[in-house]
Amino acid sequence: MIIIKHGEVFSPEALGRKDILVGGGRILAMEDSIDPSVLPGKVEVIDAQGFVVTPGFIDGHQHFTGGGGEGGFQTRTPEMSLTMNTQNGVTTAVGLLGTDSLTRTVENLYAKTQAFNAEGITAYMLTGSYWYPSPAICGSAERDLTYNPRVLGVKLALSDIRGPHMGVDDLASLCANVRVAALVADKPGIITVHTGILPERLEMVAEVVKRFSVRADMFVPTHINRKDEELVRQAMDLAKKGAHIDATCMTSIPDAEDRHMNAADMALTFDEAGLFDQVTFSSDAGGSLPKWNEEKSRIIGMGVGQPDSLRFELNLLVNQKGMELSKALCPLTMTPAKVYGLDKKKGRVAESYHADLLVMDPATMEIRDVLAKGEIMVRNNQTVRRGYFE
């Protein structure tokens, strides 16, 4: 068993100083004081004096098997490793495909999802890719959702020249199929929408919600934190109807000419409109960060997304923008847990919940200790558990 003592607990709501007892992968007790000497067997004590204890991050947008490829085979990014997640506080992750579903497959994504689960974190996946009809393991997106316990929904691209250029009837049909499969399998059945830069933006999603009475909460439009007032307006309209809006986290503050804004700034904009509870943060980790020439016709360089962007945006939101930590944690914990149907076991620090826990310095949001499924992954800033080939 493990006891985390003397930490200020944020569940994400502030609970004050508590001791947390962990065993069997779950939080067994949370009390003002727990004496390790009265417990049977070996008990490891983590002293969190001066630190905050929070739920582990839930990252709903990762390229487990790598991404990229738009600049030739040499620009395919490598697979993610376990420590890319654990060192950055991610204890639950959802993998998906991107542009390339030719050299990347949903079968390979499933294998990597299972590998992450075996290595110690919790991993799920979305079937499909940018394209429609959706590539699938069992022959269709709805069959994957029904029969594969690791599949929580579908990935799709809209308003992007690399996307399928589907019609509104096609989208309505996909929504109906996903909805039925979600009901049968008792899953959330979400559709994560990669939102491109074409002028239509999210118009097709709004139309299918209006014309076909599709539930707006099926949709998770992502990459919405752009300096595009019309895109933000459309996303807010969908959020008012129940959709969750995902911001892609950054690792720096963009300059004035950059078309992106920080996830923290998007969250503040939605908060002013009373829509903060509809916002999630994700990292796009493992995906490519292409650097284009001036004409946007050729890639001249490539970076790789990292999960450390989550911590950067949290620190920005709390320590520079002034939001209370209890509130700022929600897009990284409680809200994505709800989106992915995990809110009865993840996203909170509470008795019987999975022991996915972070010990952080509140002044910087630097992560000192990480527990995933009750196992210590990082202790005193040192990696304790690594992936199979790390």
Where do the model's predicted regions map?
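Divalent metal-dependent hydrolysis catalytic cores, especially in the metallo-beta-lactamase
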Residues: 80-105, 111-133, 148-164, 183-198, ...
